[in-house]
Amino acid sequence: MGQGSGPGVPTTKMEGIGIMDLNILGHRGLTPVSQEMENDMYIIAGLGNPGSEYELTRHNIGFRVIDELAGEYNISVSEKKHKGLIGKGVIEGQKVVLVKPQTFMNLSGECIREVIDYYKEDIEHFIVVYDDISLDVGKLRVRPKGSAGGHNGIKNIIAQLGTDEFARVKFGVGDKPKGSDLVDHVLGRFNKDDEELAKSHFKTAAAAVTCIMNEGCASAMNKYNG
């Protein structure tokens, strides 16, 4: 079964779910970011579903890692644009655009395509963070490219971009219990212990993203792959 809106959520069950302003200050050195940012920036997206009912679900781990980055570097991800929420800022001297698609998981690629086209950035400067049921809770796996692996959000991004050669940080949310429904699992919330475990790794996931920008995927893989 696919992993994306929940992995492989039938459209008959849950349609679409797989289911700032200008002077944002960078955390390091509080560098103002002008309205017209130069090219040479990174677009960092976290995947999830919009709406309070999905806020703390396993499938929204990508959103939560973006929130971690935004909080650490004082970036407001609140501008409604390109079918998503975006925030412009600086992370360790590197200009970035943080993105939380608001299309629901299965259509995440529509938002990503618009953002990349608007900023005219190369795919090499795109990083995506998302949930992975094949990894234990809190475990990370950095990859420079690869298939969707059953994740419908990534599947749509690959379809929209026409390539799977973009960096990603997979965040483990644990596999479903035997005999349970996969959709219910990814659209469900962690138990208390797993929630605390996941939260304790948000900062590490954010660090993996910055490592990809500063040192490349190979270095990030060596440092953060669990």
Descriptions of predicted regions:
Residues 1-37:
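Intrinsic disorder/low-complexity segments
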Residues 150-153:
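Hydrophobic alpha-helical segments within soluble ligand-binding/sensing domains
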